[in-house]
């Protein structure tokens, strides 16, 4: 079995992008941390032939929803909001409008697009995560992409 540090190094960026797509950039780091804490506990029992990336995306999906629910119950102080976000090595910094457009999609479409195009999961695994059929996952992804294309065309003409 590979050292867990190697798993984090290889799959960490994908997990962060999935967390970001599910709950947004503000809470994504917390969900990422929770994902790898949970994964670390379960990693010794993971079968050798398991798809590690799919396993991590499943955990990330669940932890992101947990973090989002927990944070939605907490008050947010507005006085401490910085004027400008911190610049980090994040692929979203080059395309903030893409992440905003993705966040505007209905939940199942957003998740299907993120899991397929960001995490690279097949529709059968996406269907398990979303609790629907592979055809429904494929349709949600296609509808989400159609909406994203429409939003970008509108932004280009604005």
Question: What are the roles of these predicted feature ranges?
Answer:
Residues 61, 65, 130-158:
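DNA-recognition helix of helix-turn-helix
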Residues 2, 74-103:
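Acidic, proline/glycine-rich intrinsically disordered inter-domain spacer in sigma factors
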Residues 112-116:
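A short pre-motif secondary-structure segment
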Residues 1-6, 16-34, 43-50, 134:
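Short, charged helix-capping/linker segments at alpha-helix termini
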Residues 30-37, 50-62, 139:
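Structural recognition of an alpha-helix C-terminal capping motif at a helix-to-coil junction
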Residues 16, 36, 106, 110, ...:
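C-terminal flanking helix
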